[in-house]
Amino acid sequence: MRSPICHLFSAINSSPFKIAPEKEQDLKTIVDDKKIIISVVSEPGFNIRVRKNESNNSHEIVLTVASLEYIWAFSNFFWVFTQEYSKSQKNNDEHFDLTGKNRLKKSDELLKWARKNLQTTGCESWPKKCPKPEAYLQGSEDSQVASEIFLCAIAWILHHEISHVVLQHPLVTTAFSTQEEREADSHATKWILGNLYESAPELKKRALGIATAVLCIQSLEVENYFCLQNTHPAAYERIYSNISCYPVGNEELIEALCTVMLQYLFHGKNINVNLDGESFSSILGDLLCDISRLTSN
């Protein structure tokens, strides 16, 4: 098998339908009418895109194996990191050690491997003794949860690409590309979250998938890997625009998770999180403003 991520290919293909099953028939109509297909290629880079085949007027969403591996590795790290961080807080620990626990250490090792693989050959072997995706309902609990988060994240990314087709955006870079990316983000997020009421049980899981997708992109931008430079809005802007517009309950779980992960991603960039805000929404908003100022300098 080329990569353990291959276990999830079937689930990846069905994820845009399963993320919002109440709109499954509407999506099927779009996919059939626009002749949208998904293909997976082996190449380096986070180069997920849609291209048109003029000969049969079909639209092909292209996913790279390396990008799928990175998104899964990030989903796994996001889950493990936030769980261990929560335990550390409950224990009133003064310090949080990324290398102190094997569970977190292995997740961190996998994420670093996935980033390096993404930026080099794109076809390196999955590291042994690290977490990995398994067939459905197999593997460790962490692996299963990571795969669920991953599938929600990739569903939003696929809906983003489908939105380009639906909105009839030119599939080339133009002066309007950044605005078109904002429109595709908004269309995808509205498709997934738009018809849910605030207390709907599905809302948190879907919002977590969207948050994971944009935080994953942010993790690459922090490392100066500008895979989407000059064509997409900055990742911090996408976090704000796609998370803040849909309240996900009074406990603000998604905002809290985003704040914790951003705090980790920017821990070496002289950004201090103001934890005295009146809510996690305000704390996250202040943090994103600080990130904006940092990245614009």
From Swiss-Prot:
<dbReference type="Pfam" id="PF10463">
    <property type="entry name" value="Peptidase_U49"/>
</dbReference>
<keyword id="KW-0645">Protease</keyword>
<comment type="function">
    <text>Interacts with a short DNA sequence about one-quarter of the way into the major capsid protein gene 23 of T4; general translation inhibition occurs when this late gene of the virus is expressed.</text>
</comment>
<protein>
    <recommendedName>
        <fullName>Cell death peptidase</fullName>
    </recommendedName>
</protein>
<keyword id="KW-1133">Transmembrane helix</keyword>
<dbReference type="GO" id="GO:0006448">
    <property type="term" value="P:regulation of translational elongation"/>
</dbReference>
<feature type="transmembrane region" description="Helical">
    <location>
        <begin position="149"/>
        <end position="178"/>
    </location>
</feature>
<keyword id="KW-0378">Hydrolase</keyword>
<feature type="transmembrane region" description="Helical">
    <location>
        <begin position="61"/>
        <end position="82"/>
    </location>
</feature>
<keyword id="KW-0812">Transmembrane</keyword>
<dbReference type="GO" id="GO:0008233">
    <property type="term" value="F:peptidase activity"/>
</dbReference>
<dbReference type="InterPro" id="IPR019504">
    <property type="entry name" value="Peptidase_U49_Lit_pept"/>
</dbReference>
<dbReference type="GO" id="GO:0006508">
    <property type="term" value="P:proteolysis"/>
</dbReference>
<comment type="similarity">
    <text>Belongs to the peptidase U49 family.</text>
</comment>
<keyword id="KW-0472">Membrane</keyword>
<keyword id="KW-1003">Cell membrane</keyword>
<dbReference type="GO" id="GO:0005886">
    <property type="term" value="C:plasma membrane"/>
</dbReference>
